[in-house]
A protein has these predicted regions:
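C-terminal "cap" of GNAT-fold acetyltransferases
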Residues: 90-94, 98-105, 110, 114, ...
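Acetyl-CoA-dependent GNAT
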Residues: 3-68, 77, 83, 87, ...
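Conserved glycine-rich acetyl-CoA-binding loop
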Residues: 61-78, 99-106, 110
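Alpha-helix termini
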Residues: 59, 73, 84-86, 125, ...
């Protein structure tokens, strides 16, 4: 992603309860792990995040707020997953999603991911937030 992409992403605002995913305006750590997703006209529609740890690939993503809730998530998720697999060749793909985000969890389950655990992370702005760990079942 370019500096302009990160600046645009920082302006994205999600409706409740998804405002948890709004940018905190802090510089992104490890920007080289982020990839821009664009439509046919070149407009930024989302981002992909990958972190490889040995043969396990952590996958994260975000879809532009005005595109959420329109049944685009599964195709977007699968396209990003294929991109990550082609780039990193992992033996396992895993992700972490806020437990309240049932909409995303359903998408990930439809894509073949299953819950493998839960953990709590503490945020200055949000306090304690439960996350679901999910692994791809192949």
């Amino acid at each position: 992603m370019t500096a302009e992409d990160f600046a645009e992403f920082a302006k994205w605002r999600y409706e409740s309860p998804y405002e948890f995913y709004d940018s905190d305006q802090e510089p992104v750590k490890n920007p080289e792990r982020y990839f821009a997703a664009r439509d046919d006209d070149g407009a930024l529609i989302g981002f992909l995040y990958f972190e490889q740890k040995e043969d396990v690939l952590e996958y994260g993503l975000g879809l532009r707020p005005d595109l959420t809730g329109r049944r685009l998530g599964l195709d977007f998720f699968r396209a990003g997953l294929e991109f990550g697999r082609d780039l990193y060749h992992p033996s396992l793909v895993q992700l972490f999603v806020a437990a309240f985000n049932e909409r995303a969890i359903k998408v990930y389950e439809r894509a073949g991911f299953r819950e493998t655990g839960r953990h709590i992370r503490t945020f200055t702005r949000w306090g304690e937030v439960e996350f679901v760990s999910m692994d791809e079942q192949r």
